[in-house]
């Protein structure tokens, strides 16, 4: 369960708007779309241990996936080939159609109680959800939106892990590392088969611990 982590997110300073934002680098994608032949089910026991895992982010060239992250307003990337994936009073999620039936590109828009809307893009692959923390100043409402998305990942998607990624050259990199470690995320060492080979990016993972009764 992530209830305690959700409360920590709401109390954290990681998502607070800063006076001086970082330079945006949205043109550089951090994740790639895998081919269906490379995806396979495998265990993931510890972020610091290079165990077996799906080579869905191998060196084989894939079309780049741009994940700009939350924008803090109602602007969204409209895709003519997007289908409704999920919708409730807090989330509206559309899926971009791809040739890979094991990988889903999700456009997430969360509606907050104060009327704000925050948008994210994510990749759902092999029961793992990948979210990029956007460069620059995070929009107002980001922490609440992230908490909603994390809760949805656990209760609705029932994923095994949630990965976040951000560029290593961020000015607030140290603060992000401290905050997400406090929330229960672990640093994923470079070269792990569950994350893309991107030396310019930092990946962290949250593993959901489920009771045996939840799996019945």
From Swiss-Prot:
Disulfide cysteine pairs (residue numbers): none
GO cellular component: cytoplasm; nucleus
Keyword Transmembrane helix recorded: no
Gene3D superfamilies: 3.40.630.60
Molecular function via GO: ornithine decarboxylase inhibitor activity
Protein's GO biological process: polyamine biosynthetic process; positive regulation of intracellular protein transport; positive regulation of protein catabolic process; viral translational frameshifting
Keywords: Polyamine biosynthesis
Function: Ornithine decarboxylase (ODC) antizyme protein that negatively regulates ODC activity and intracellular polyamine biosynthesis and uptake in response to increased intracellular polyamine levels. Binds to ODC monomers, inhibiting the assembly of the functional ODC homodimer, and targets the monomers for ubiquitin-independent proteolytic destruction by the 26S proteasome.
Subunit details: Interacts with ODC1 and thereby sterically blocks ODC homodimerization.
Assigned protein family: Belongs to the ODC antizyme family.
Name of the molecule in the record: Ornithine decarboxylase antizyme 1
The species this protein was found in: Xenopus laevis
């Amino acid at each position: 369960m992530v209830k305690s982590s959700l409360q920590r997110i709401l109390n954290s300073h990681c998502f607070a708007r800063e006076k001086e934002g970082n330079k945006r680098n949205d043109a550089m994608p951090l994740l790639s779309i895998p081919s269906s032949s490379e995806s396979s089910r495998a265990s993931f026991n510890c972020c610091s241990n290079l165990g077996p895992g799906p080579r869905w982010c191998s060196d084989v060239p894939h079309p780049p996936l741009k994940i700009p992250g939350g924008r803090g307003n109602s602007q969204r990337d409209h895709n003519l080939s997007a289908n409704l994936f999920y919708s409730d009073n807090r989330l509206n999620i559309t899926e971009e159609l791809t040739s890979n039936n094991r990988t889903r590109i999700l456009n997430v828009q969360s509606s907050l109680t104060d009327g704000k809307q925050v948008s994210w893009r994510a990749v759902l692959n092999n029961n793992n959800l990948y979210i990029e923390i956007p460069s620059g100043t995070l929009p107002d409402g980001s922490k609440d939106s992230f908490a909603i998305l994390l809760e949805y990942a656990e209760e609705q998607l029932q994923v095994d892990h949630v990965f976040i990624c951000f560029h290593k050259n961020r000015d607030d990199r140290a603060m992000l590392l401290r905050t997400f470690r406090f929330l229960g995320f672990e640093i994923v060492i470079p070269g792990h088969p569950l994350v893309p080979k991107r030396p310019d990016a930092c990946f962290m993972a949250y593993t959901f611990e489920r009771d045996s009764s939840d799996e019945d």
